[in-house]
Amino acid sequence: MEQSFPKRPFRTHGGAHVPHHKNTAHTETRVMPPPDEITLPMTQHIGAPCVPCVKKGDHVYVGTKVADSDAYVSVPIHSSVSGTVKEIKKVIMPGGQAVDAVIITSDGLMEHDPAVCPPPEIKTKQQLADAARASGLVGLGGAGAFSGLKLNVPPDKKIDTLIVNVAECEPYITSDHREALENGKNVLAGIYKIKEILDVHRVIIAIEDNKPDAIEALTRIADDPKMDPNDEVRVLKLHASYPQGAEKVLVQAATGRKVPAGGLPADVGCLVMNIGSVSFLASYMRTGMPLTMKRVTVDGSAVQNPQNVIVPIGTKIREVMEFCGGYTEEPQKLIMGGPMMGVAVTTDELPVLKQNNGLLAFGAEEARLLEPTDCIRCGRCVAACPMNLVPAKLEKYAERKDVEMLKKLDIMTCMECGCCAFSCPAKRRIVQAIRLGKYYVKKEAAKK
């Protein structure tokens, strides 16, 4: 059945108007030279960790597979430099867990693996999902979800709409914005391959209205009869509101459909993919080169020259910052990701991971943590919650460790977007409490 295109976005509940701080939107992306050494942790995605398939002393190329897993929800990891495996050791991840990591010393040559070649012709959903897995692709929007799982649509689900996510609602982050401007034709090539294999006849490129140049560029390409002969791809301009790029929020804004609690976009006939993931798939199908590089926004008041950088995965944060001119002052807060949903880290010796789309360094003023006061029951957190939850109650019962009430209040539906804490006049640390509450619920479930 023919699908109509929305003329304007549908209304969604909640959200917050956060400051944009898109300082690097109009700065051309630079490519960073290879570092002397990279660190590749075995957990760079949602799902089972990988196991090293190389050993100390092995020579590797750019694109050589260094780790994999037999688990279904997992993706292989590839070297982003040519050189020699120095060692395999435990490293601490941003979340605090210790995992194995492959350490590779670069020879500076960046020689591509001779075994790398374009995948065989892809004609089926399973072949597309297998190719996505073999490429090492995870969602490049920041979540790190296994892209092959999305593309391997169950037989009982019919996808009629592909939504390309260019919302990029997090403050500071502009890597998707630059992808749209610099690789628009590649994005359209990826769209058409996915569209053809999944038999989708409506593609919505959803982008916030604070990116007028990217909207113009994508619209120009999508309106080109040579690129879109059947007029099945349209650009939808969204209101700039956080968290517009969250999957369930985006599906509702772009189609008017509501993804059920605990459900997926496929349950309502939608597939959501980040623009970077779509563009990468097009490149992979053309060249066979797996995911080894990542465009990262480097910004914050403590960064000398904020910009977008193509970084070899596994490069230390410190080296990326040095490439951007170093620090203007001693950073008081380092964040991997955006300021709303990113992870604050204690050292810049951590490596850039596949899902990292931002590295932020802030001085003392921006890093200042306000002291919370008593909840005044104003209801702003309820109005802001895009999932229609009651964050104040979730915080209260999390502090009490009341698992039954937390389950009744549907705590696991929370996406931890931070709208509640951002909107709270009492500066309550609501998201922190909810994360603890989720831990208590999972711990209780594990006992049964």
Predicted regions and their residues:
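Short, well-structured beta-strand-loop connectors
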Residues: K55-D68, E87
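Acidic low-complexity segments
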Residues: E87, I92-A145, K150, P154-D156, ...
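N-terminal, Lys/Arg-enriched amphipathic/low-complexity engagement segments
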Residues: M1-C53
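Hydrophobic alpha-helical positions that pack around
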Residues: V200-I317, F323-T328
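Histidine-anchored nucleotide/phosphate-binding helix
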Residues: L181-I197
